[in-house]
A protein has these predicted regions:
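Short beta-strand element of the alpha/beta-hydrolase
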Residues: 82-93, 97
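Catalytic nucleophile-loop/oxyanion-hole region of alpha/beta-hydrolase
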Residues: 99-104, 108, 120-158, 295-302
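Mobile cap/lid helix-loop segments that gate and shape the active-site cleft of serine hydrolases
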Residues: 48, 205, 209-242
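Short beta-strand/loop motif that positions the catalytic acidic residue
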Residues: 246, 251-254, 258
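Primarily recognizes the serine-hydrolase "nucleophile elbow" in alpha/beta-hydrolase
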Residues: 145-214
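C-terminal catalytic histidine-bearing segment of alpha/beta-hydrolase fold enzymes
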Residues: 267-316
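Conserved alpha/beta-hydrolase "acid-adjacent" motif
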Residues: 259-268
Length: 316
C-alpha cells in the first residue's frame, strides 16, 4: 500500500513538472507570435529595436586603458529566489555593434526575465585598426567574473550562468567558456574571481577562423585579417582548438546555407566535443544565410524553441 502511495505521489509530481514546462513553452510561443506580423522579417530586426523595461542600465564592469565598459542588467524584481544568469554577447564581426538586445530575441529575454533569470547584455572593446581578440575575450570573461563578485548584491545564482551570442559573439563566448579561469585576465580587480559558466548557446559562431569566408563579411574584417596573420589568429582564437573534456554544455545552431561561416565547421566542433564526452547539442537550419535571411516561420519557431528548452533544462 505504501509503495502504491509513493508511486502515485511521484506520478503527480512528474505531471506537475511537465505541466509547468509546457505552460512556459506556450507562454513563450505567445510572446514569439507577438514579435512581429511575420517571423520571416526576423533578419532585419536582428540588430535593432531595444527591448523595454531595462532594470539597470550602463553598469560599469571594468575599465580598459581608461575606457569604461558597460552592460545592461535586466531583473524581475518580484522574484526573490537566487537568479540564474544569462549573458548576451553581441556579434557584428568584432568591429562594430553594441549591447542593445535586438528585437529578434527580445521575446526570449522577456520570458527568461519573467521566469526569474537575471539577463546581462554586455559590451566589449571593438576592433579598429588592430586585432584585439585577447581584450575582447577578457571582456567577456570579466563580465562573468563581475557576476561572481556581485552575486550577493544582486542575488545571482552563480551555479547557473549561461552565455548566448550570435556569430562573433558566439566565438568570444566559446573561448571565454572553454578557457581556464586564469586565462585572458583583464581587469586586475576581477582577477581573483572565477569565469566558469554552466552552458553556452552558440548561434552560427566561427569555430575555425581559418575557414571564414571573409569576402562576404564587412570590409573592416578583411582589413584586419591579413593573409599573413590569419594562420596565427586561427591557432590562438578558434574555439575548435579549445576543445577538451568537461566543457560547459553547448547548444550549436547553424544553417547549411551560411554564406560566411561554413556549416561544416560547426559539425566539426560538435563532433570534437562529443568525442570527449561533452554534452553538445546541434540544431540545423536549412535555408537561411548567416544573417538569418530566408528564415521561414517554421524554422524561426524551431530555433526559438530549441534555445528556450535548452536554457530552461540547463537551469534546473
Amino acid at each position: 500500500m505504501r509503495k502504491k502511495r509513493t508511486l502515485f505521489i511521484i506520478i503527480i509530481l512528474i505531471t506537475l513538472i511537465i505541466g509547468v514546462l509546457n505552460s512556459i513553452r506556450f507562454k513563450f510561443l505567445y510572446e514569439v507570435l507577438k514579435l512581429s506580423n511575420s517571423l520571416a522579417t526576423i533578419s532585419s530586426d536582428f540588430y535593432s529595436e531595444p527591448i523595454k523595461d531595462i532594470t539597470y542600465k550602463d553598469i560599469i564592469y571594468k575599465r580598459n586603458d581608461g575606457e569604461t565598459l558597460k552592460f545592461d542588467l535586466y531583473i524581475n524584481g518580484e522574484i526573490k529566489d537566487p537568479k540564474p544568469v544569462i549573458i548576451y554577447v553581441f556579434g557584428n564581426g568584432w568591429v562594430y555593434g553594441d549591447k542593445v538586445i535586438p528585437e529578434a530575441i527580445s521575446s526570449i529575454i522577456d520570458l527568461l526575465k519573467d521566469e526569474g533569470f537575471a539577463v546581462i547584455s554586455t559590451s566589449y572593446e571593438l576592433m579598429d585598426d588592430e586585432v584585439i581578440f585577447d581584450k575582447q575575450i577578457s571582456d567577456v570573461k570579466d563580465t562573468i567574473r563581475w557576476v561572481y563578485k556581485n552575486k550577493d548584491k544582486y542575488n545571482f545564482d552563480v551555479d547557473n550562468i549561461g552565455l548566448i551570442g550570435p556569430s562573433a559573439g558566439a566565438q568570444l563566448s566559446m573561448i571565454a567558456a572553454f578557457s581556464d579561469d586564469d586565462e585572458f585576465v583583464g581587469d586586475v580587480s576581477l582577477k581573483e574571481y572565477p569565469s566558469k559558466v554552466k552552458y553556452i548557446v552558440d548561434l552560427f559562431g566561427p569555430s575555425d577562423l581559418s575557414k571564414i569566408n571573409l569576402s562576404a563579411g564587412p570590409s573592416e574584417i578583411v582589413d584586419n585579417f591579413t593573409a599573413e596573420d590569419i594562420e596565427s589568429y586561427s591557432k590562438l582564437y578558434s574555439p575548435i582548438n579549445y576543445i577538451k573534456e568537461d566543457l560547459p554544455d553547448t547548444l550549436i545552431i547553424h544553417s547549411k546555407k551560411d554564406n560566411i561561416v561554413p556549416y561544416d565547421t560547426s559539425v566539426e566542433l560538435y563532433e570534437s566535443g562529443i568525442e570527449l564526452n561533452n554534452k553538445f547539442d546541434f540544431y540545423t537550419l536549412e535555408n537561411c544565410t548567416h544573417y538569418l535571411e530566408n528564415l521561414s516561420n517554421k524554422e524561426a519557431l524551431g530555433l526559438y524553441m530549441n534555445i528556450i528548452d535548452f536554457i530552461l533544462s540547463e537551469s534546473k
